[in-house]
Swiss-Prot record:
AMP binds at T59, R64, E85, L86, V87, G113, F114, P115, R116, Q120, R188, R199. Its main location: cytoplasm. InterPro entries: Adenyl_kin_sub, Adenylat/UMP-CMP_kin, Adenylat_kinase_CS, Adenylate_kinase_lid-dom, P-loop_NTPase. ATP binds at G38, C39, G40, K41, G42, T43, R155. This is Adenylate kinase 3. SUPFAM superfamilies: P-loop containing nucleoside triphosphate hydrolases (SSF52540).
Length: 241
């Protein structure tokens, strides 16, 4: 239910009004982000969201929200999950359709984590066509696997604080120890070379047909994701301008 405006603090209300005024002149955009783990999507996504006044739609988050809100689609999704089944493509597309109706999605969206297959891409296109819209751009965060391995397998975490380090790019003062507490650092299970290799193999097999599908439509922008974040941001802005 919408909040009573009288109960919203003035500063929050003013900030939101200014945001909407700034966004009113922005062109609508519907963008898909594609890229392997560690490619930098997470760094660029909030910048794209703020710059172009888009909402960020991550399929995992949307599914959890729909289940928690007990929407009709969320109830169906929970039934599938409780049985240990995958949530059907039609259900996921329906949940995306629901999410797109939010006020924050008026100027368009960034879709992250979907589509993962050509069939999903086709179903998404069909749903958007019914609304008279389409995907405007697919940002492909292209990066060599060897660079990803260096990025990811060098990551170390201080468990209790969440502080992160990298053996090459942001090393601790003393190898293997947290700068503040001197406690040992750990590596996430997913950040090992063996786990990364299998994740990347699965990603390439699954994603290449999707990129080919959108390339035929002429809407893929291949980004040099190995570059420093600020340079990637410049490429993103050029691709979306």
């Amino acid at each position: 239910m919408a909040a009573n405006l009288e109960d919203v603090p003035s500063m929050e209300l003013m900030t939101e009004l200014l945001r909407r005024m700034k966004c009113s002149s922005k062109p609508d955009k519907r963008v898909i982000l594609v890229g392997p783990p560690g490619c930098g999507k997470g760094t660029q996504s909030p910048l794209i969201k703020d710059e172009f006044c888009l909402c960020h739609l991550a399929t995992g988050d949307m599914l959890r929200a729909a289940v928690a809100a007990k929407t009709p689609l969320g109830i169906k999704a929970k039934e599938a999950m409780d049985k240990g089944e995958l949530v059907s493509d039609d259900l996921v597309v329906g949940i995306i359709d629901e999410a797109m109706k939010k006020t924050s999605c008026q100027k368009g969206f960034i879709l992250d984590g979907f589509p993962r297959t050509v069939v999903q891409a086709q179903k998404l296109d069909e749903m958007l066509a019914k609304q008279g819209t389409k995907i405007d751009k697919v940002l492909n965060f292209a990066i060599d696997d060897a660079i990803l391995e260096e990025r990811i397998t060098g990551r170390w975490i201080h468990p209790s604080s969440g502080r992160s380090y990298h053996t090459k790019f942001a090393p601790p003062k003393t190898p293997g120890l947290d700068d503040v507490t001197g406690e040992p650092l750990i590596q996430r299970k997913d950040d090992t070379a063996a786990v990364l290799k299998s994740r990347l193999e699965a990603f390439h097999v699954q994603t290449k047909p999707v990129i080919d599908y959108y390339t035929k439509k002429g809407i893929v922008a291949n980004l040099h994701a190995e570059k420093p974040p600020k340079e990637v941001t410049v490429e993103v802005q050029k691709a979306l301008s």
